[in-house]
C-alpha cells in the first residue's frame, strides 16, 4: 500500500480489502498501539477510513481472520518529494526500538531538540504527525 503514495496526486481515492488488524494499523491514531510506521507514513499522504468489516463467511474459502474494506483519500497538502525520503527515514529510525524514547532512537540524527520544541522523552507512538514532519525538515543526513 505504501507504493501507492507515488500515485496520490493522480487518484481521487483508493479502496482495499485487507486483514482487519492491518486496517486498524493503517487507521491508527496518535497515542494508540496502532500509531506506528504504517499509519504515520500513510497519514502524511492520505485520509484513511475503515468502511466496513468483512467476515470470513463472505469468502468461498474462509480465511481464519476478519477483513476490513478501507478507503484512502489523498491529501492535497502532500509532503514534498525532497522531504518524503527523510520523513520515511525518521519514522523508521524512531520505531527501531519502540520502547525507547525518540531522543535515543534518533541519536544519530543530531537534532537540536530545544530548537524543534518537541519533548525528546516521548516514545515514538506519542509523537504527532506534525512533529515527525518537523523533525524530517530539520534532519540533515
Regions found by a protein language model. Give the residues of each.
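Class I S-adenosyl-L-methionine
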Residues: 1-129, 134, 140
